[in-house]
């Protein structure tokens, strides 16, 4: 690893995905966010000469909104469709209790990204490490924020560096103002609307061969009743519903039961409490 401290580089390489294999079509809903990311990241890769001057792509994108709505999945999809190396970095991987280690880790991260470019550095829960500065900040925290800004500026100011930093947060207003300025492109990933909820429910059930016995009318009723649910909530509900037929099997027969023998899911006649969606709606 060129110009990288092996102590920190080896750990960061574990979080590098050469190709994610995720496509934008794998993400249900989030249409406006997908269009914005395609315009900001994928199209410039297809024709770099066209995207110059005022059309030059940004080097920092902030994905924000309620948790569980596909921020990480979207970032992986963008990396895959633009053929860029993807670094999936958590806040914990950048912090350290030892003075100086956090700064060295950040320097190593950006250097590895330079060596592997074009690259996308995705930092989940970025607010936990780059929150607004206050008197309560420790010396380690202040130094880490400063180092991140230095490395970020270095990567974005050098025209030869093809590094994109994508941050994800549920609390954008907690971010330091200096950090926000470095993410000029800000994309909201809100809770899915009724149409997106229907699409996600159907896609999930069809993918796992569990749609037989249901119809679009059934799922549209459920989509209407699940307002306020996130993408991950809906997937969790499908998983819970998938367990309902298993619970009806006699325990003595469970070990020899074949999946093809399980009864299909069905929608019950009344939906009184969507909080218990799997048991009351699909069962």
Each model region followed by its residue ranges:
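Interdomain "pre-motor" coupling segment immediately N-terminal to P-loop NTPase/helicase cores
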Residues: 1-20
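C-terminal engagement/docking regions of AAA+ P-loop ATPases
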Residues: 14-25, 221-236, 246-283
């Amino acid at each position: 690893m060129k110009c990288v401290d092996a102590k920190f580089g080896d750990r960061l390489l574990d979080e590098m995905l050469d190709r994610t294999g995720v496509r934008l079509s794998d993400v249900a809903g989030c249409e406006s966010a997908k269009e914005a990311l395609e315009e900001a990241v994928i199209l410039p890769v297809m024709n770099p000469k066209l995207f110059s001057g005022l059309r030059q792509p940004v080097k920092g994108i902030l994905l924000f909104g309620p948790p569980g709505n596909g921020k990480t999945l979207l970032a992986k999809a963008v990396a895959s469709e633009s053929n860029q190396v993807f670094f999936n970095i958590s806040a914990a991987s950048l912090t350290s209790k030892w003075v100086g280690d956090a700064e060295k880790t950040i320097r190593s991260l950006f250097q590895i990204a330079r060596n592997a470019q074009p690259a996308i550095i995705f930092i989940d829960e970025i607010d936990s490490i780059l929150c607004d500065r206050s008197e309560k900040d420790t010396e380690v925290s202040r130094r880490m924020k400063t180092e991140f800004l230095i490395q970020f500026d270095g990567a974005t100011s050098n025209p030869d560096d093809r590094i994109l930093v994508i941050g994800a947060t549920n609390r954008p207003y907690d971010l330091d103002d200096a950090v926000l300025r470095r993410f000029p492109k800000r994309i909201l990933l809100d809770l899915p609307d009724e149409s997106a909820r229907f699409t996600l429910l159907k896609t999930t059930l069809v993918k796992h061969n569990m749609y037989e016995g249901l119809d679009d009318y059934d799922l549209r009723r459920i989509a209407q009743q699940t307002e306020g649910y996130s993408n991950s909530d809906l997937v969790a509900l499908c998983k819970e519903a998938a367990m309902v037929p298993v619970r009806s099997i006699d325990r003595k027969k469970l070990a020899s039961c074949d999946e093809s023998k399980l009864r299909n899911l069905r929608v019950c006649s009344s939906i009184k409490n969507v909080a218990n969606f799997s048991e009351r709606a699909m069962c």
